[in-house]
Amino acid sequence: MKPTAQILTDILAEVRPLIGQGKVADYIPALAKVPNTKLGIAVYTNEGEVIKAGDAEESFSIQSISKALSLTLAMCLYKQEEIWCRVGKEPSGQAFNSMIQLEMEQGIPRNPFINAGAIVVADLLQSRLSAPRQRLLEFARQLSGDTHIVYDKVVAASEMMHGDRNAAIAYLMRSFGNFENEVIPVLQNYFHACALKMSCVDLAKTFSYLANKGTSVQTGKPVVSPTQTKQLNALLATCGLYDGAGEFAYRVGMPGKSGVGGGIIAVVPGEMTIAVWSPELDASGNSLAGTKALELLAERIGRSIF
């Protein structure tokens, strides 16, 4: 079965009672102000059709979903061995901002989707781009077809002000020799990436290349190679949902990436990209209602990579 607007609307109605059972991210004050009742879903097919329901066109802070975009950009700029000598490809099994593992493993983060790994990717981008912040914004605008995408400067400033742990992670990696640039500018770029404001429709369009062997459905142009697409989807399937990646694979069965803003993207290779948004999070930092919505959608349309 193919997704329809009615199926999406029905799914949102089914998951709405879950609102109130999760917790909006409050350690970033600007995120704590987002109404917990927001709920949206969008599907973008490889034929270029948008199917949506709920608050699918309202922009929100994508947070760690940006890590998939940053890694894609780094893969366009570096040979693979230059990236993977500095960050691993394994699930961490730890909280996304844990430092214990990083210390034990000599400053090499487990994967590019936990904070330490994403900060290494931000460092890589800083080394190759004269204006990494502008380049990432242009990348998001180009892939989504939405020229109105911006950074939420209030969120970025809020994260920088409350970002001591991320700064500690960066300095710890630098002490092990796994850092090339000044820490503060890299952190500023990292926090801005997390503060990208996009809607479910924007996100589904942006990541369409992951469902289409590396070619953006929105632009018709190659973003990465088919091999790199396979690699990205493998990392998303194993590491994309913090320490809830196994649970997500079990329930949803798609490569995905979440953010503490309540967004999740999911990929059905060869067919479609999906984005959901509900700000309340579960214990792993993933959208509670959003995960359930994706689980129901996977069941209804009979899709899974497994």
UniProtKB/Swiss-Prot annotation:
Enzyme Commission number(s): 3.5.1.2
Residues annotated as signal peptide: none
Keyword annotations from UniProtKB, A to Z: Hydrolase
Top-level enzyme category: hydrolase
Residue numbers binding substrate: S64, N115, E159, N166, Y190, Y242, V260
One Pfam family from the record: Glutaminase
Catalysed conversion reaction: L-glutamine + H2O = L-glutamate + NH4(+)
GO biological process: glutamate biosynthetic process; glutamine catabolic process
Database matches in InterPro entries: Beta-lactam/transpept-like (IPR012338), Glutaminase (IPR015868)
Gene Ontology molecular function, alphabetical: glutaminase activity
The protein's assembly and partners: Homotetramer.
Family classification: Belongs to the glutaminase family.
Name of the protein in its database record: Glutaminase
Species of the source: Vibrio campbellii (strain ATCC BAA-1116)
